[in-house]
């Protein structure tokens, strides 16, 4: 609050908060408290003497005026609790963090934000938005102008057709209008008499005036005659006449040359007019809609008083504009009387500057024109190539933004409704308090004015005196500084020769520096040339290397092609081998069968004819053979010899089988390794299993089982805490188990096909091989039995059984499993035979 000395108030800020319930309650409480505390006791002494009472009243009024002049001191606690950010009602109003004191700062921030919004909106400056607006409006504007220009010929044709029809029917119009001739004559007579009566005095008054200005009119006529004579002199003389003739000649040539142009233009005009006439129907709908809407609008504005109000507003605006025109014209004339010389100087100076800038501006314009023209030429194909992408982008963005706006519309509507309702409620609650607030501010203003008004003149006088005293120092300061500056200028001038010498020294140094710079540039050029040479050599070497690589690739491709051709030939020959083997084995089988039959038949015939002689001879032969064999070989038991012979035969057959199956086993191991790598890489191993037999699958299963056991041992060696490692190994074990299942299925399938399928049994090669193998077996059995029978060995004894089993052992091998088991038995027998010896 102000005191007798006065307090300068820098700013009174008002901050309006939407929540006014607490504000109103606190304001009412504080006002009631102030009313209770502000109490004054006025002592009144009553006297019956009227004169004394009047004097006391005057004295009291003088005291009140004196106290009012001193000011009213009201103790108000405005201490602000900075920790709790609360300082009471007045503290909140006049200085609190959330009081009226922050309204100025908030208003300044709001103004800054509004200015920033004006400068930048959505990340784009005003210039950028102007550019966006131009780009957005350019295409529609060009389209509208082009459409109007395209429709203009048809509209002109329509109006021209209407005018031509009216001209052609003018006689009919005149004939139709002739019925109005009597009425028009009556009207003309009435109007003419009115003009005659009214204008007769006027023209009578003009008579003396015309008589007075007759000499002046004659002077004007003389001037016109002189002007016509001057023009005639120019056009009738030889140069003027030649120019007129040339103009007429060139005009004729121009009109002659316009013939094709007009023909083409007329054809284009007619074509465009025809197309526009076909589209007149499409123009009727919008025109009809416009006229209907315009009629409805006119009916509305003329019936509800809007038009009358608009005319009144227009009248007021027009009056203000015309009044402003008068005032501006008067002030402008006054300003022109004062600004004639300065404006003339400005125009002359600006003209001189512009004329001097014309060469530079011309160069800049040429530069900009060339650069922008070249830029446009180069950008045109780029824009053409990007046009589909721009169209797709515009369509996509349009769809996306339209959908987003449609989705955000209801939400923003609800938010706007909430904000509008809140602000409306807050302003409605604040509105009743504004008169009291304005009254309070008015009281503060009145007190400030009352308190400061007596002191303003004295303060102004004091400030004027201070300014005058300061201004009186100016001559002294100038008179002191000017001599110092005058003395300083020669000292500064003494430095100029030194600076000139320095510049001259630098200029003298330039001839020395320039050769050095040229040498450096030459060295740099040589270095660049060397680099270019090295680069060229490297490029050449790379080109040669590329050519070598291409030749190598070409040779490799030729080798692969030749290898492929050779492989095809080998495959073709291999495909022919089964047939050749089949035919050979078939013939061999037939020959063997026939020979066996002939041999057996001969034996049967011979034995049948000489049974007794054969028996005796066989006994002698057997005895002699046995003795000879025993003597030659040094053996006592032929059965033992034949037993070992059968064993050695089986062992040799096993070795042969092992040597024959060794490549197959190695191949199975290789395929198992490939299968393991395929499982590690996660590829499908089905292609590897194609074309494999049961034995190879069994070997693969054994390899996989060994790998599974190894991984299981490795998994058991990993600590249980390492779940990731154990899980990884378990995944590998699961993959191996799944692969074993696939191999087992493949083995079972092959086994089932071999046992139950008819395909293998129907193969001629298999039949031939089986017949070939069964023929010597049968022959050996029959011959052996007959021989044993001849030498007296028959029945189920040890020798006959051993020989029979040996023959069956040698020739009855049906599968690889049997061969492997035979190999194991032979190794065991060899060990036993060695121990027995």
From Swiss-Prot:
SUPFAM superfamilies for the chain: ARM repeat (SSF48371)
Q: Which InterPro entries match?
A: ARM-like (IPR011989), ARM-type_fold (IPR016024)
Q: What is this protein called?
A: Minor tail protein Gp26
